[in-house]
């Protein structure tokens, strides 16, 4: 049987010859001869055309390896591999010698805010979880009432925003009814009990389609709950919608169109956690769950003006969620306040024995932590990098000034030496394997045809180069550990990508994803067009509590997170 072109080229990729013409020329010779094996003459001819010289001994050795491996690759490709099958190699962001605080302390939430039910319950659509929870706890509103309010808003506004793939009305009503019965019986589970939320459609929810934003999976039902979904159910939360993801976790375009930014319907919401960013900003859910590999929580949160938390790698189980990159994927909350993010993280974090990268490190949240005791850095090179928007620069400067006014002294920090490591080598190297089947089996159904082209090209990524990129990543992690020895948290301007470029901020997003450090993005003003602007906080590995405490103090001293897109506000 003649091998296919991909398995043939894979052998030369492993030899480091993929970037040359040699593999392609040799494949052409193989097709021309209509044979299933390679001959010495074919190797010599292909080498000559490619401008490479091999000795007779090298050709003899290569010939045996080429033909032997062709058979191995062909057999390997016959093995069905579900996206959920992970390699037995687990990334750990902790470097040798690093000390992690594993002592568990009491979870200390902030004092519940005063909440009075508005005459029109839709007036609570933009309330944070902490305030919605008070309505439920004090029995001023039922979970069923809040659920119907959010379901109605989803049905009315989703046609404009394209932020929900599936509205889970039947499930939501059942869960809300159960929550109300438990609360009436005195079994209150905590601040998420009865709160309606949405989850990015990379996460499985039993009984409903999990589409990954891709047309080939429009009707595909994964008959299990992702760990984040089951843990939120245990906390009493109510699932009202599967929210959009960019196709196969890329950008904000999916098979139904482009998810819109509630602040400006001519713009996309960014991605790939496009639906969570849009729906949370528009007041269509109480909170949402997003995922990130290289910016997919931070970017839509910042663009849509919500508070987005990307936890430490290994904090939250990815079980039941689509894999893009085993060593980079993370799951986290997208909310309307920092305190909300802390409450949701507390519910979803910790080992489940299903995702072996998750570590047993307690989340010791203390809403009243004295932030004056924190060592706070700022990435000077990023703040010194003037953008195309004077207003964004002014907002960054004002945020630093406000944080200093809270009794914090800022320390200059700089990114590590190997910060220019291309995260794409790892994302696309692993993603090419993880998403091989949907891209190869029904490529004509994908919205992003460039994804197919890239997938084919990246079959030629040499294994040696991928592994060496991971080794450079180790150096980067060690360097970052030294940076974080001097600070508990550091501040960075938000990475707006092409909107208002800041190369250092963009590099920070890449670096902290590679090293696994947590980040939270919070609103800090508006630009000249009236679109939200944001600030990024970076914490130590498993140091979300300190990072969120500083972000909460900043948020409480400002009111930017209380601003909402006028098109979706109901008086």
Model-derived regions: residue spans:
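Acyltransferase
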Residues: 140, 145-151, 177, 364-365, ...
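N-terminal export signals
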Residues: 7-28
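Gly/Ser-rich catalytic/binding loops embedded in alpha/beta enzyme cores
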Residues: 56-61, 65-294, 401, 406, ...
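N-terminal secretory signal peptides
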Residues: 1-3
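Short helix-loop capping/hinge segments that flank enzyme active sites or metal/cofactor-binding pockets
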Residues: 111-123, 193-212, 370-380, 411, ...
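Structural helix-boundary/capping segments
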Residues: 156, 234, 281-380, 397-406, ...
């Amino acid at each position: 049987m003649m091998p296919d072109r991909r398995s043939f080229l894979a052998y030369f990729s492993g030899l480091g010859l993929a970037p040359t013409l040699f593999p392609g020329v040799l494949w052409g010779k193989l097709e021309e001869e209509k044979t299933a094996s390679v001959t010495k003459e074919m190797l010599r001819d292909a080498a000559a055309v490619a401008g490479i010289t091999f000795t007779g001994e090298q050709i003899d050795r290569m010939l045996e390896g080429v033909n032997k491996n062709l058979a191995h690759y062909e057999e390997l490709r016959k093995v069905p591999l579900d996206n959920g099958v992970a390699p037995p190699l687990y990334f750990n962001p902790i470097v040798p010698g690093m000390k992690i605080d594993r002592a568990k302390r009491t979870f200390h939430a902030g004092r519940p805010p005063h909440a009075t039910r508005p005459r029109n319950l839709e007036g609570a659509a933009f309330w944070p979880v902490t305030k919605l929870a008070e309505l439920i706890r004090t029995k001023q509103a039922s979970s069923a009432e809040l659920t119907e309010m959010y379901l109605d808003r989803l049905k009315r506004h989703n046609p404009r925003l394209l932020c929900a793939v599936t509205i889970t009305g039947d499930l939501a009503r059942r869960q809300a009814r159960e929550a109300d019965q438990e609360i009436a019986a005195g079994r209150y589970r905590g601040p998420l009990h009865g709160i309606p939320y949405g989850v990015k459609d990379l996460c499985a929810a039993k009984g409903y389609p999990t589409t990954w934003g891709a047309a080939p999976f429009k009707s595909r039902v994964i008959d299990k709950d992702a760990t984040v979904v089951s843990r939120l159910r245990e906390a009493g939360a109510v699932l009202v919608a599967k929210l959009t993801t960019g196709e196969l976790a890329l950008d904000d375009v999916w098979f139904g169109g482009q998810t819109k930014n509630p602040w400006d319907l001519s713009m996309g919401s960014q991605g790939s956690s496009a639906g969570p960013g849009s729906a949370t900003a528009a007041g269509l859910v109480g909170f949402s769950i997003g995922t990130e590999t290289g910016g997919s929580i931070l970017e839509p949160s910042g663009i849509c003006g919500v508070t987005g938390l990307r936890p430490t790698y290994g904090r939250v189980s990815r079980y039941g969620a689509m894999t893009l990159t085993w060593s980079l994927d993370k799951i986290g909350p997208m909310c309307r306040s920092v305190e909300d993010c802390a409450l949701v993280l507390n519910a979803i974090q910790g080992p489940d024995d299903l995702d072996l990268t998750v570590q047993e490190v307690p989340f010791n949240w203390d809403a009243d932590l004295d932030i004056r005791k924190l060592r706070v850095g700022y990435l000077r090179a990023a703040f010194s990098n003037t953008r195309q928007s004077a207003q964004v620069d002014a907002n960054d400067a004002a945020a630093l000034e406000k944080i200093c006014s809270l009794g914090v002294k800022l320390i200059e920090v700089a990114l590590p030496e190997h910060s220019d490591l291309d995260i794409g080598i790892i994302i696309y190297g692993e993603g090419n394997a993880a998403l091989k089947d949907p891209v190869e089996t029904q490529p004509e159904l994908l919205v992003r045809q460039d994804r197919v082209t890239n997938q084919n090209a990246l079959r030629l990524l040499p294994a040696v180069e991928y592994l060496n990129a991971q080794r450079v990543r180790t150096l980067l992690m060690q360097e970052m550990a030294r940076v974080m020895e001097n600070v508990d948290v550091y501040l960075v301007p938000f990475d707006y990508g092409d909107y208002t470029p800041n190369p250092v901020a963009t590099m920070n997003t890449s670096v902290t994803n590679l090293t696994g450090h947590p980040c939270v993005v919070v609103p800090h003003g508006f630009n000249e067009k009236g679109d939200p602007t944001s600030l990024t906080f970076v914490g130590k590995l498993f140091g979300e509590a300190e990072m969120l405490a500083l972000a909460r103090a900043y948020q409480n001293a400002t009111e930017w997170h209380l601003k909402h897109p006028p098109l979706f506000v109901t008086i």
